[in-house]
Amino acid sequence: MSKSKRKRQQPQAVRAAPLPRPDSREIAVAHVSDKYSEYPSNGLTPVRLAEIFKEADAGDVLRQAELFEEMEEKDPHLFSQLQTRKNAVTGLDYEIIPFDSDDPRDKEIAEFVEAQLGGIEGFEDIMLDLLDAIGKGFAVSEIMWSYDEGHVVVGDIRSRHQKRFFWDSVDDSFKVRTQEHLARNELRTNKLTVHKYKARSGHPSRAGVLRVVAWMYLFKNYTLKDWVAFCEVFGMPLRLGKYQPGASEDDKRALMQALVAIGADAAGIFPDGTAIEFVNTEKTSSTDLYERLARYCDEQVSKAILGQTLTSDSGGGSYA
């Protein structure tokens, strides 16, 4: 029997699949409404704060993102602690190191990447925007791709507000709201830079530092409101005007105007026979109570953000 000869197959060169062209369109388009806020911190109560957190736990972080933004604006101590964390990163030097220092191709790639980063305007601002994740749990920037002499290059990197993103209630996937698809839109590959910071274990919507210190912010806010009201009542002596039993309405009106003028100008005139008395109040113990409570809240914020209170203020302190 003749045996059929098997043909020996020649090895074929395997061609790498072409890389997909980067999407040069702007996906997470900044909307005019992004700069506006519902200001959820106005009239904030424990009940409202819990409601905002429940919405974020369900995937909708819009009101939580707006609240966190206001917290940084309204609390100078909180702002300074977060800036300390961010400046510790932006102040560092960075270097692009080739994967293989002996491979000329790797050196060429490293030099290209370094030139790209150096050519991006405001690169430190971009890093600062991404470090916003420390407080809010995540931060997103969109890469605007372009072409230059046959190379795909980074034309710009634009920060996107956290309230444009959400977690899907069905599969918990991270999605972005766009002008075309306000309900759901998947994040595209190599298009968005997402920095997720985990101050603690759990879902990213609950992992930011500001989620931890929000209650201290609320209690301090109550304390400051009461302190301001206290200062308005007891911050200056009570001006008590006295008039004679037979004083006319014009005399009474003149006395009242004199009392008001003394409050603004520390001077006034009034008819002869009337008297103005200044009644001093001693409420130092209440003042100390407000100050101690506000300082306590600041110390807890410092511990949560920096891990200590020693370097937070010019005075003494202790490590947490």
Features from the language model and the residues they span:
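Feature targets compositionally biased, intrinsically disordered low-complexity regions
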Residues: 42, 90, 314-316
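A short mid-domain helix/strand-loop element embedded in enzyme catalytic domains
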Residues: 230-234, 261-279
